Structure formats: structure tokens, C-alpha cells
């Protein structure tokens, strides 16, 4: 990830030096992060695209292929925090959307902060758990606070980590009301966003929204689909989840564009010679987080609509600011939602792994070895947290207990490797440990990290979604676009 962002800085400097003797800063930097964008799909579906979206980026921009996040356990929160901070979870602290708070033994959200109230939401959130500065913060410092920073995203974590600590505002969609939301952390909610909520928000329009394929069925041939009928969704059919379904559809990208256009029309962003930042997040995942097997046609249509959303965004930027005054970068979050387990019919290796059962058996093993006590305090997201106070009371060596626990966990079916915190922090370097170490934060991660074999399903018996482990990664195409002044 550091290499990716270093490339961005090099391009900015090199482009400016070639153009003139003194580097000209852009009026507006637009960061477009596309959640769950897959490079293989992006290229496979290219015959369905127009000339003004992805193809324009490819022709007129500069593309960096095969970029890879250098840490494990990527999700939306950790990816966007890495993009905008330029460093890994081991430094920025955002190891995932949720992690276990060792002091309370309860999962916490990466954005939770009860010190701040919400606008158009009952969420109390802020970017305070992000431990490093971001592009937005550094822009504010460089411009002595004069550069404007707005972040617009379907989801709260994406907006907050893109806006950083010093941004002017972060906006995300309330999944219960469809209104654009914000936090008092950034001060007053902008008047133009309130006006949009009161007059044009999707709650006024969603009843009439229907999603059908743009093209005839015969054009969606890139993924196997066994259905004979075209899909048709009315978001309003499921009244209790209509906004959640909308947020997990390609229509949300047009809503992001709509609020971005409001900012360009009614604020001063991009209007003077002081560089501003507009950080946007799109969605390119499966509809309503279904598997590809369930919605092959939908995912192809999603990329068609995504291409058109990008074309619309470029047109708005050209009209309002002039693309010659804009630097745009486009990248992906580098992960995808978990897919369905492989069918046993095809004899693909796999099975089910239960972290809660694994933690219970580990506690029994430690009791048999060291005497009565609750040695395992908690477990979460393939990590196990040990009871440090009990170990201190019994005068047991933490590193030794971690190592013995890791060796015990290695005996479980489905476990590829178990890493102790001591090994991750102080052990010798290997390519595997390097990526896990980069995703590990000593104050937020567990004592033990379990690497489950590919093809196995991590079953959550306490509620929540199950997860199928895949060890392949989706390369992150990074695109930079600047257009020369005519």
C-alpha cells in the first residue's frame, strides 16, 4: 500500500515538472475509491462500457496494474484508512470495521465515539480511532486550513476515514431513513447538504425506483447465469430494508454523484487556486451482499452502471471546475464479500471452522496444564484474547502461553497456521508473517491470530454472517487522470 501511494506522489510531482518550470497544484483533487471493484470483472466486462467512463480513464490517464495491499484481513474500513493514511493497520490502528476492546471484552466499531452527536442519524461517530494523519489532514496543514475537504460515501467508515481528522465534513447515507448523515465532530452540517436532504433525498424518490438490466439478456454472457428471466427489483418492496438494499446497489453511486454535484454548485470547493479534496466512495459489490452465483447478471449490470456513473462524474467535474484543473485517482478496496461455500458434489477441499468452539477447547487445555481459571477472555474475527491479569496472578510467562496456545490451535482441522502476538511482533520475517504483521496492532489485536485454510467456512454461531476463506487476492488497479490545459 505504501508503494501505491508513493507512486501517486511521484506522478503528481513529475506531471507538474514536465508541464512548466514551477509545479502547478490542481484546484481540486478527487479521490474515487470503488468498494469491492474487481480487476478481473473490470476487464472482462469492458465491451459493455461506453467511451466516457472507464475507457476514458484508461486512454487519458495512467494505470498502475497489480497493486496489492500489504496486509491481511482487508475490509472496507481498513482499506480506505490505508489508502488515505498511506500506511497499514499496524500503524493507523484500523484493523477492521470492528474489533474486540480488550478492556471491556466487547466488540467496538472503528468509528464509534460517544463524544459526538450525529446529523440526520442517531449514530455517535468520529474518525478518532484512526491513529495517523491522512492525505486530507496533510492538505489542511499545507494550506494552513484553507483547503476544503469533503468526503461522500455510502457508508460511515468510508466517509470518516477519507475525510480524516481535519476535514470540513463527511457524509454517508442513513440506512434507516435514506438521508445524508454527518457528525458534530466536523462542526456544523453544511446548509447545502441539509437543503438537499429536505428537498431531494432518496426517501422522496425511492418508491418509484426500479432496477432492471440496461442491456438485453444476451449481452450479459461473461458470468454463468442459469435464470431464464431478467431480474427486476423495486427497492420499496421491502420497506424495512429498502435503503439498505439501495446502498448495496449501483444506484447508490448516482446518489454519491448527486451530493458531490451539490457541493460543487453550492460550496466554494474547487473554485480558487488553493487545492481542495473531494473524496468519494462508490459501491461495486454484489446486490444486497448476495453471492455471485445468485446474481451473476446483476453484477455485470452493476459494472455497466458504474461505468456510466464515472462518465457522469467526469462530465460534472469538467463543467464545474475544468478537468485541466483536476487531479483524479481511482482505486479499489481490494476485497470482496464472502461467497457461497463450494459444493461437496465437486470434491473441493473444505469444511467448517468454529472459532467459539476452538476458544473453549483452548481454555480447557490451558486449565489442564496450568490449573483452574478463565485463560481465554474473548474471541473475535479469527483472533483469541488471553486473560493477561490471570497470567500475571499465576506468574506465568505470556510469550510461553501464547506459543503453547498457538501449537495447540495448529492441531485443529481447517487451521493452516496459528500466530502468537510475540511471534508477529518479534519473530523472524517471512512473506506470510509480513502481511499478517502489517494488519496487526498490538493494542487492538488478539494474542493469537488464526489463519484458516482456503475453502473452509468460518461459522459464527453467535449470530452474524459466515465467511468462506479465499487466499487469492484481487489486484488493485490504480488509475491516475490529469488532462493537459488546452
Predicted features, each with a name:
Residues 1-25:
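Bacterial Sec-dependent N-terminal signal peptides
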Residues 479-485:
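Conserved small/polar residues in nucleotide/adenosyl-binding loops
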Residues 30-33, 64-66, 82-84, 148-153, ...:
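Structural recognition of the beta-strand scaffold that forms the well-ordered cores
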Residues 23-42:
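Mature N-terminal segment immediately following signal peptide/propeptide cleavage
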Residues 49, 75, 97-124, 132, ...:
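Secreted, luminal/periplasmic, and some membrane-associated catalytic domains
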